Amino acid sequence: MAVSKKSRKSEPSAAFTAADGLVLDQSEIMRAMLAAQKGKQKEESEGNDESDEEDDDVSNEGEDEGESSGSEAESSVAAQRNLKRRRSLSFELDAEGEEDKENEESEPRPQPSSGAGMLSRTALATKDMTPKPRSKPQPNGLASASKPSADVTFESLGLSHPLITALASINIKKPTEIQAACVEPILSGRDCIGGAKTGSGKTMAFALPIVERIARDPFGVWAVVLTPTRELAYQLSEQFLVIGKPLGLTTATIVGGMDMMKQAQELEARPHIIVATPGRLCDLLRSGGVGPGKLSRVRTLVLDEADRMLTPSFAPELAYLFSQIPAKRQTCLFTATVSEAIMELANKEPPAGKQRPFVYRVASDTLTVSNLKQKYLFIPSQIRDPYLLYILQNPLEDIDVALRVDPKKAKAREREAALGKKGKKPRQAKEEEDAPSVPSTVIFTQRCATAHLLHLLLNSLDIPSVPLHSHLTQPQRLLSLARFRAHEVPVLVTTDVGSRGLDIPEVAMVINWDCPRRSDDYVHRVGRTARAGRGGVAVTIITERDTELVKIIEDEVNVRLEELKLDEDKVLEGLNKVSLARRMATMEMHDSGFGERQATNKAKQIKRMKRDAAAAGKA
């Protein structure tokens, strides 16, 4: 929701300020976000034609899936320049918290400069695929990552015995590198910027010192944690609850898609910690449903996935929240991908008499963990379906057998739930007894319609799956995540709403159905596997339109993807079966009215934009 000019003028000029005088200047943050606004608006206009086509007919999903035509192809040089310009931009989320908006309406994919329509299997192999080192400017005088000494313990970091006991109950006995580096500075009240690889323990790096400080001087509301997605907000709340409940701490989760009245009551109860998406928290504070001054005593503000939060999409909401939270507070920014906006804050000269914030950055040039096997599959876009089925039914050797889910067990659970006879063992059909073991897999797509169609397609092929995208209700989304976490189904098909921060420890494989358009998106997607020291495999499907994209990603992530070679004859044996399943899934999706919901959501968004524009004009 946009903030009117009048209301912005009346809001105090808040600053990111630590309790001991350390400062992160808010005006610099807002300038960094708004500087990208012009580029973002141009990006949105480029995606309008594509998004209109996406909603016309679901039955055309399998042919183009949002890809641009050959006449709109960009040169390879232009593609690299445009993508690098957009590195600091993030796809939008719904500003009011009513729904998340993925980048399904993002810009067309850059095309190979040759303009060739047919796929050449040697085209990618002949390119210079040697990754170039990332250029990572270090802030002057700021800390970078270093391996903690062997004698670093939670006790030596200053945590109390009850909190250490709570950690031991969830089998956390030794701090990770980012925890060893950041816990003490945050505990002492310093502002902190933390950047580390996915699965490195960033959440506990700020959660532990916050819980410890609240336990020493408890009152509500002490801390506000802002996240870009609803699912991440629920996950953070669960982690705060696990370590904070033994100490008597309370947490409220404020996200869109849930009962606002109940959330208002939770805020009135003054919980110690609020975990929220910016849009819904702003709505509650502006609506008058809660009393004034609910955030007037906040000591700590955390922006999780800060690279995504510090974009123009969230600027109005953050500006309003800054005006509601005290200027003298501790501020922590955490992310797996340190954007230019964050680096500007880290490098900025502090005001006279002030110190810089504590900054932790991973020392490696490579943004992905070493125990992650990263592969690419170079195939024509028209035959992705049979390749997907083959990969799921014939798991790669790099995947641990222990991380595979038996489809017949998943089918049995579904029948038990349907019949309501949990104590009775259901009969197994012969085809289920012979079903292959499917690895625990997350499949990422660019669009909601693609994710839902693949979910229906896999179910038609007797591979149980659940969808996760913004066109589902919030209870449906939470149920999908719960079933996948509990290993009831082996496959989660999601848009980028599932790429940020979600911690599902036993994911064996990530498949990028659509090649990510930005290197940051790639890092967050593949980070759903190989977490906490475990192994994992990431397979990115590259079509004839993605050759320039994958080269840019390799250069910026500083890793070379290994080609995955499969027996094409064996793969295409299932082509007829998969084609029939796709037709059935398309009809089911059409009958369910999925396209109507899509059109309704878009109409609501247009209406909100017109309303906000009219309000800004009157002001």
Curated annotation (Swiss-Prot):
Biological process terms from the Gene Ontology for this record are: rRNA processing
- Name the PROSITE patterns for this protein: DEAD_ATP_HELICASE, HELICASE_ATP_BIND_1, HELICASE_CTER, Q_MOTIF
Q: What class of enzyme is it?
A: hydrolase
- Role according to the record: ATP-binding RNA helicase involved in 40S ribosomal subunit biogenesis and is required for the normal formation of 18S rRNAs through pre-rRNA processing at A0, A1 and A2 sites. Required for vegetative growth.
User: Which lineage is the organism of this entry classified under, starting from the top rank?
Assistant: Eukaryota, Fungi, Dikarya, Basidiomycota, Agaricomycotina
Q: Indicate what this protein is called per its UniProt record.
A: ATP-dependent RNA helicase DBP8
| Comp. bias regions, Polar residues | 137-147
- Its chief place of residence is nucleus
Helicase C-terminal domain spans which residues? Answer: 430-572
What PANTHER family does this protein's entry cite? ATP-DEPENDENT RNA HELICASE, ATP-DEPENDENT RNA HELICASE RHLE-RELATED
Q: Which residues bind ATP?
A: 196-203
GO molecular function, a single term: RNA helicase activity
